[in-house]
């Protein structure tokens, strides 16, 4: 009995990544053995994602307010370089997608458009939506997971409490610590949640439906892999002047894997916060940069918008010159930063990019439908890239600031 409890204790306290790997293998095995049984355990995945999504808004709000309220005077938060990295990384992703799409042009088999979807009419509408999310009712922002509004109100409350008594600030610090403990508990349940998610995904879709779009997926995933394994490490190396791969691989392993299966940047915020804490990053920095990254750091979305738009142009025989491709990179990068402000995310911003080439809205919506077909893989890979990059760039900016402080 003692040996059994000792084994269970070791299992519970062991490597989370190994446990997640076991969950993935078990999920695939169950789905291969019995589709019905796999569908029965789908609720485990839904519960896990639901728990992360439920705690993420209050975690961000309290952590941001507490960090700013308890911030010492003249403390550097390094937010400017992080925002610059986010924007540059998103543009680099769009540019990489353009180059890869031109090297490997793809034809789409267009299907019927998605019913009941309403894409934005222009970049102005996307920015307008984002601005109004900024001044959303704070209670509504917490209820709906509007992280732009949550950040704005969290920063506002933190600044207002900056001159409050020490006991008031301590209450916020204690509540913040308590919520972080709850997050740690939820993250320990990741292997069970991912087991349910993998089993359900394989049972419901398999990969037969996506086989017809193999070349399109190869271009999409190839662009994302280049960003994750070549471009991002290069950017990090320029910032920290040392081998970037230990940091990049750790972030992909501990943040990217979870994000891949939850397919939600919002649900992955608590995971990223916990990883930043493990990396011993500045709490005043990551408490703001991680939720901000979940909103504007959208390299994966920029790739999706660019690749599908250029595939549509190639299918219709539209010639794309270098200047137009460059303009598409800029539009895709700006649109991607606003993806969180659009219901349906990156896919519903495709008609906006298609309008650059005079592609009609009807055809553009058929391209969106193709996006939904490959969404099982596209959305998962996009989220993994977006979410892991948030931690990578935050860590790079923090380390660069520390190195600068040591030198001078």
Swiss-Prot record:
TM ranges: 11-31, 43-63, 82-102, 141-161, 192-212, 216-236, 290-310, 316-336, 363-383
Family the UniProt entry places it in: Belongs to the dicarboxylate/amino acid:cation symporter (DAACS) (TC 2.A.23) family.
Annotated compartments: Cell inner membrane
Name by which UniProt lists this protein: Serine/threonine transporter SstT
Species annotation: Shewanella sp. (strain MR-4)
Gene: sstT
Recorded topology in the membrane: Multi-pass membrane protein
Catalysed reaction equations from the record: L-serine(in) + Na(+)(in) = L-serine(out) + Na(+)(out); L-threonine(in) + Na(+)(in) = L-threonine(out) + Na(+)(out)
Domain of life assignment: Bacteria
